[in-house]
Amino acid sequence: MTQHSQSILGARVMALAIDFILLETIHLLFFILLADKLIQVTHFDALALLTFLILFLFVFSVSFLFLHMAYFTFFHAWSGQTIGKMIMGIRVVTNDNKFISPSVAFLRWSGYILSFVPLAIGFLWAVVDKDHCAWHDRLAQTRVIST
C-alpha cells in the first residue's frame, strides 16, 4: 500500500467517524426530547411504558436509517463530500472522476448496509482491495480521492 493510499484510507476512517459522531449527536438529542415526552405521557404506568418503549425503539431504529440515508445521499450527491469528508479533504467521485448523481449516491449508501452487515467486512475490504475500494464503492462504481 502506498503512502498516498494509506493516507486516503485513514482519512476515510476519520471522515466516517466524524460523520457518525455528528449524526448520532443529533439523533440522540432528538430522542432525549422524545424520551422526556414519553415519560410525561405514560406517567410510569408499566404497560403503557412497555408499549411506548417498544414503539420508541422501533422509531429510533427507523429514524437512524433514514437520517443516515438522507445525510449521506444528500451530501454525496450535492458535493461528493459529507462534513467529515470536507474536514478530511477527500471526495467521492465516479470511477471516471465525475460527480455522482443522487441515484448513485443512494446506491452507495445502500452499499453501506451490505458492507456493514457481515461484521463490517465490506468496509475492511478497502484495506486489501488493490484500488482500496470498499464493497459500497464497487457496488456504486465510485472511489474516494483527495481534494
Model-derived features: positions:
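Short, small/hydrophobic-residue-rich motifs at membrane-helix boundaries and re-entrant hairpins
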Residues: 1-117, 146-147
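Membrane-embedded alpha-helices of multi-pass transport/permease systems
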Residues: 74, 118-121, 125-128
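Hydrophobic alpha-helical transmembrane segments and immediately flanking/interface helices
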Residues: 124-147
